[in-house]
Amino acid sequence: VGGGGKTTLLYAMASHCAQKGWRVLVSTTTHILRPENGLWAKTDAEIQELWARGSYAVVGSPAPKGKLTAPPEADLAHWMAQADAVFLEADGAKHFPCKAPAEQEPVLLPQSNIVLAVAGLSALGHPLKECCFRLEQACMLLDVPPEACLTPELLAQLLASEQGGRKRVGSRAFYAVLNQADTPQR
């Protein structure tokens, strides 16, 4: 959940686990970019073929703009039961490095036992109105105006809040992931 490179992180983690010989499934409960590397599987046979090749399999129903949406619930449950590891993207951020969840977000499945809240460090030092998806919710949660610059403290508050990164986590394991740390300043 969150912003700042969820999909990239998801695919990197899936690749890492697949390289260990695990049967890895990637999907979404909302929308995700369709992979361009031939890893989108539409049938049981395609999933098994990808796993046999030592790759991960991405499942989902076609959606506009090169995306996938959640596959039918019964299909997803069937495929999840066959996998050693499952990675699900559970909300969207429109490519913003940070976000606050909407009323209906995140869409976590009961089977999910770990939640990662992702934020991009590229947002630090920028006004919320420039770097945060669902600006109104973020401003209310943080009690700051849209012009307020995102500080490490505000980002931590956003990630740790039960109305922010920890929303709907409940008793699941929770980790905050700070990415986009690819410059000396970050």
Protein language model annotation of sequence segments:
Residues V1, V24-T28, V58-S61, V86-A90, ...:
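General beta-strand structural signal in soluble alpha/beta enzymes
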Residues V1-A14, A18:
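Glycine-rich phosphate-binding P-loop
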Residues A14-G66:
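N-terminal phosphate/diphosphate-binding loop that engages ATP/GTP or pyrophosphate donors
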Residues D44-I47, F133-C149:
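Acidic, Ser/Thr-rich peripheral helices and adjacent loops at domain boundaries
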Residues S61-A100, E105:
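Phosphate-binding/switch loop-helix module in NTP-utilizing enzymes
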Residues A90, G120-L121, L141-E147, L158-S161, ...:
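G-domain G4 guanine-recognition motif of GTPases
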Residues A102-L124, L141:
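Inter-motif core of Ras-like GTPase G domains
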Residues A148-R168:
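A short, acidic, amphipathic alpha-helical segment used as a generic capping/interface helix at domain edges
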